[in-house]
Amino acid sequence: MPECLVTIYWEQRKLSDIADKVTEKNTNLVVQETFTNSAEFGVISQRDFFDHDISNSESIGGYYVVRDEDFVYNPRISVNAPVGPVNRNKLGRNGVMSPLYTVFRTHNIDTTYLEWFFKSNYWHPFMFFNGDSGVRSDRFSIKDAVFFEMPIPTPSIEEQKRIGAYLDRLSNLITLHQRELEKLQKIKKAMLEKMFV
């Protein structure tokens, strides 16, 4: 049988088996930088996303502390994220996020593999079945306890690492080719402009 047709059964684990909800608040205002979670750009500084700070030092005491490699679920619905995005903090520093976000820290799973899982739409049916768009049409509503019941296909840790590394390489290759395409399009445009002057 061709390798591509072999059905592989991976263990299904609940998100709660591999992650814990972060409840650490910024009560002593130790962390001053506020993050946001964008469907397009991932976890980034709020200042970079909005060109200024939305939060202020008086309001961030009740915000959750987001450590390096933590994951963040943003319930804001968009074209790119119909149930809201889940992204990993890869900024290499800590920040804080509004309690509107769900922050979780993983264990016993490769973070790159899990990041790619959340870039897929595999988990969307679970969200649609267990949550709703709520009162506000731009926000998705799901209880934390239900969110952490989400099934995650979990191969061996070695296979997770291979899958994550493969998808990273593929993504980098696509980015490289997109840059080349943009260069060629600029050259073509310049040639057309010179040709018809």
Question: Language-model features: where?
Answer:
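Feature detects amphipathic, helix-rich regulatory segments
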Residues: 1-197
